[in-house]
From Swiss-Prot:
Family affiliation: Belongs to the NKAIN family.
UniProt keyword Cell membrane, yes or no: yes
Subunit and interaction comment: Interacts with ATP1B1.
Alphabetical list of InterPro entries matching this protein: Na/K-Atpase_Interacting
Tissue-wise expression: Ubiquitous. Expressed in multiple regions of the brain such as cerebral cortex, thalamus, hippocampus, olfactory bulb and brainstem as well as in cerebellum with low expression in granular cell layer.
Membrane topology: Multi-pass membrane protein
Annotated protein name in UniProt: Sodium/potassium-transporting ATPase subunit beta-1-interacting protein 4
Gene: Nkain4
Record key words, sorted: Cell membrane, Membrane, Transmembrane, Transmembrane helix
GO cellular component: membrane; plasma membrane
Spans through the membrane: 35-55, 62-82, 151-171
Main location: membrane
Amino acid sequence: MGFCSGRCTLLALCALQLVTALERQVFDFLGYQWAPILANFTHIIVVILGLFGTIQYRPRYIVVYVVWAAVWVTWNVFIICFYLEVGGLSKDSELLTFNLSGHRSWWEEHGPGCLHEEEATAGLGALHGQSLVVGAGCAMVHSYVEALHSGLQILLALLGFVYGCYVVSVLTEEEDSFDFIGGFDPFPLYHVNEKPSSLLSKQAYLPA
């Protein structure tokens, strides 16, 4: 009963991780955040692998999911430090876009409660009188929105790590117990195969 509840909980966590990762992937695409896009894509693949391993009772796949959960926690801690500018990191840098574009987080302009103000741009930043749309009066700064997203991912990954380890341990114990019981088979296969060969040897020594 405990294993069933643990397995069902892990399935629910994997499903929830898929939903939240897809939601995050959409907004990272809108903001052209290439590093998070690659990380989210890898995360989605591994979560699907863990989901498959849990359904099909494949502990090796779940082990891959558990190892990735630790990596995913580390990545999201980095994202929190990046947006909260901890450890010398700056949210204004182009680290997450691989210096391919000057885009920022999508939540910077479209956060909850943000009002769009059009500011006339000049110099190299403007082309043919284009204007830059900036979010103003936001109910929550985009840095906190990104940090909350990462915090949710950390929470789900930690829970997935714990339940993944539990399911792997139970499956491994069941496999070991199955092999242990099979080792005491009173009629092993080699005994069955040994009997005809002994009869043939006896027949060879019989006088004609």
